[in-house]
Design a protein with these regions (language model features):
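Helical hydrophobic small-molecule/effector-binding pocket
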Residues: 78, 96-121, 130-131, 173-181, ...
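C-terminal peripheral helix-coil segments that are non-catalytic and often amphipathic
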Residues: 1-10, 107, 111, 141-154, ...
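Short, structured helix-loop boundary elements
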Residues: 23, 44, 66, 70, ...
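Short secondary-structure transition hinges
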Residues: 67, 82, 107-149, 164, ...
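Hydrophobic alpha-helical connector segments
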Residues: 85-117, 154, 162-169, 201, ...
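Amphipathic alpha-helical linker/stalk segments
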Residues: 70-100, 135, 144-147
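Helix-turn-helix
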Residues: 21, 25, 29, 33-67, ...
Length: 221
């Protein structure tokens, strides 16, 4: 007769586990409601109701609604900053790596289509983003601007203002992702469709390549 081994009881959730889960629920709820209603339109009451937490949870975990908003944006931006960093550190000429930055943005916005609107709604309203957002954006800007400087040295990128070049490269995928709903109506360009999304990526890569490749008479100056 076989003996059944006693099952080991699952360890109870610790207070830290519960706190981390609550924090994650609040960030997810905040991301949904900030995206739908904007910062001013998303109340703490609505966010905690959406997250299934008590009203004081936002203050406990984030100090304020602004603190939660900063955490939401940081969660969205850190991964794209990491992707850009990986592209910048990859092999190839500066132009090759600049094009990989564009691809990184397209890939991230395909996975997180809400992010451009979430990020830029405060900017469009004339408000200053949270400090952590500015820190991440500065880091990305400096990484891409560094490619411009390297590209001038290796001959793969034409001379130009490094910061303006970085902003131009970033703006292409951000703008397309931001206006995607409008493009479906006036295009008709449906960036949710894989073939159209691929076409948009190839078009943007060609556009950036043409803008950054030095003319023949510039290469040996």
């Amino acid at each position: 007769m076989s003996q059944t081994r006693p099952t080991r009881a699952e360890p109870p959730e610790t207070r830290a586990d519960v706190g981390a889960a609550t924090r994650a629920d609040l960030i997810a709820a905040g991301r949904r409601l900030f995206g739908q209603r904007g910062y001013d339109g998303a109340s703490i009451r609505a966010i905690t109701r959406e997250a299934g937490t008590n009203l004081g949870a936002v203050t406990y975990h984030f100090k304020s609604k602004r603190g939660l908003y900063a955490a939401v944006l940081e969660q969205g931006l850190r991964p794209i900053a990491a992707r850009v960093d990986a592209a910048v550190r990859s092999e190839g000429t500066s132009l090759d790596r600049m094009l990989r930055v564009v691809e990184a943005y397209f890939e991230h916005f395909e996975e997180h289509p809400d992010l451009p609107h979430l990020l830029l709604q405060e900017v469009a309203a004339g408000k200053q983003p949270p400090d952590v957002v500015l820190e991440i954006i500065r880091g990305v800007k400096e990484a891409i601007a560094g490619l411009q400087v390297e590209g001038i040295a290796d001959g793969s990128v034409r001379a130009g203002h490094p910061v303006l070049t970085a902003l131009s490269v970033m703006s292409q995928p951000i703008y397309l992702a931001l206006v995607a709903p409008l493009l479906r109506t006036v295009g008709p360009v449906d960036l949710a469709h894989p073939s159209m999304r691929r076409l948009a990526l190839e078009h943007t890569l060609a556009f950036v390549r043409a803008g950054l490749t030095p003319a023949r008479n510039e290469i040996h100056r």
